[in-house]
Amino acid sequence: MNIAFFLIPKHEVVYLAVNGTMRQALEKMEFHRYTAVPLIDEQGKYAGTLTEGDLLWQMKNTGLTFANTAKIRIKDIPRRMINTPVRVNAEMEDLFSLAIVQNFVPVVDDSDIFIGIIRRREIIEYYAKRFCVNK
């Protein structure tokens, strides 16, 4: 089954600009209660995923305080997790192995422009329904 049916479009996704600040990331992730968010570059392309762990390690390893996180650019924060994106024409079967290690799967078009995400929840629900039907 094509993934477009399960896509949460970009305008409904909480994401961060890669040139934003660490403070913006902390505040947005806290407000929405997310542990990971997609990063988008100036051209609208998917640029990776920022996690709470990335932020915590940055603070621990550099001695930052909350007050000076506004000086740190997101693009300068090392990321320890790679959320592999898929193209919009992918099939659900392509997402199963990614969902094991990713909270969400970023979806891009043929020009690598970020168009949305598919959450792990939707992938699990899809396979749960298939499993119940095939029982």
Report the location of each language-model feature.
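Short, flexible segments with low predicted structural confidence
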Residues: M1, K10, L26-K28, G48-T49, ...
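Bateman (tandem CBS) regulatory domains
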Residues: M1-V13, A70-I82
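The conserved cystathionine-beta-synthase
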Residues: Y15-R33, I40, T84-Q102, V108-D110, ...
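A glycine-centered beta-loop-beta connector
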Residues: M29, V37-D54, A99, V107-E122
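A short, polar/charged loop-to-alpha-helix boundary motif
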Residues: D54-T69, I123-K135
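Regulatory sensory and allosteric helical modules in signal-transduction proteins
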Residues: N61, R79, T84-V86
